[in-house]
């Protein structure tokens, strides 16, 4: 049975992001994918907890899609976590609603990848910065996968990387939906688009 994928998209200024718009276009027409524009749906950040918990129950894969803001998510995704991932639902006694589901982050970052290192401008790797989300997923019993990032997003369009990244994004979602992605092998990568062809068995 195909997996059902929930993409929680959070970008407060999407009109400024060619890279994220390319990724959204790549998702068009994909069956089994539910896209939720959190800023569009909750412009005052008054999140419907019951609705969001219902969405989580109905899907097998949960994706946070966002631009990296100050080494974290945009504000609405933090609000979403604080309200939706309740004790007794997502964790704690009888809180098993998310157990076994797959979780990962798909984000864009303005800086180049080399900036995210011990010797770089940002001092930490992307995976290190995402550890709070990784631990959240693990506490909820989810299968955490490494991120699917686009570095240097500000120049990705003019450098011809945005559309290629968007194409890889679509291929990844299709593979997750169709259960053709080796989750164990994917978990060993530092990022999902590092060896995507190999993970998808292209040329094997």
Language-model regions, residue ranges each:
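N-terminal beta1-alpha1 ligand-phosphate binding loop
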Residues: 1-32, 36
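Hydrophobic/aromatic beta-strand patches that form the interior of the parallel beta-sheet core
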Residues: 6-8, 34-36, 63, 104-106, ...
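Generic recognition of short, well-ordered alpha-helical segments
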Residues: 18-22, 47, 75-79, 160
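Short, solvent-exposed amphipathic alpha-helices that sit
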Residues: 18-29, 125-140
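Glycine-rich phosphate/pyrophosphate-binding loop and the adjoining helix
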Residues: 28, 136-204
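N-terminal beta-loop-helix "entrance" segment that forms/cooperates
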Residues: 33-57
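Helix-loop-strand module that forms the ligand-binding subsite of alpha/beta enzymes
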Residues: 51-134
């Amino acid at each position: 049975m195909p997996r059902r994928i929930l993409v929680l998209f959070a970008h407060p200024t999407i009109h400024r992001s060619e890279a994220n718009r390319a990724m959204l276009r790549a998702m068009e027409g994909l069956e089994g994918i539910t896209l939720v524009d959190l800023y569009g749906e909750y412009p005052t950040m008054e999140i419907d907890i019951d609705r969001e918990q219902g969405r989580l129950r109905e899907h097998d894969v949960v994706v946070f899609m966002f631009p990296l803001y100050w080494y974290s998510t945009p504000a609405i995704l933090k609000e979403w976590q604080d309200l939706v991932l309740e004790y007794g639902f997502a964790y704690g006694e009888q809180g098993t609603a998310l157990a076994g589901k797959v979780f990962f982050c798909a984000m864009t970052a303005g800086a180049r990848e080399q900036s995210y290192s011990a010797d770089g401008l940002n001092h930490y790797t992307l995976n290190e910065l995402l550890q709070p989300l990784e631990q959240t997923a693990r506490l909820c019993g989810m299968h955490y996968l490494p991120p699917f990032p686009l570095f240097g997003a500000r120049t990705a369009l003019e450098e011809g990387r945005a559309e290629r990244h968007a194409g890889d994004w679509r291929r990844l979602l299709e593979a997750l939906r169709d259960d053709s992605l080796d989750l164990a092998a994917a978990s060993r990568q530092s990022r999902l688009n590092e060896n995507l062809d190999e993970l998808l068995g292209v040329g094997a």
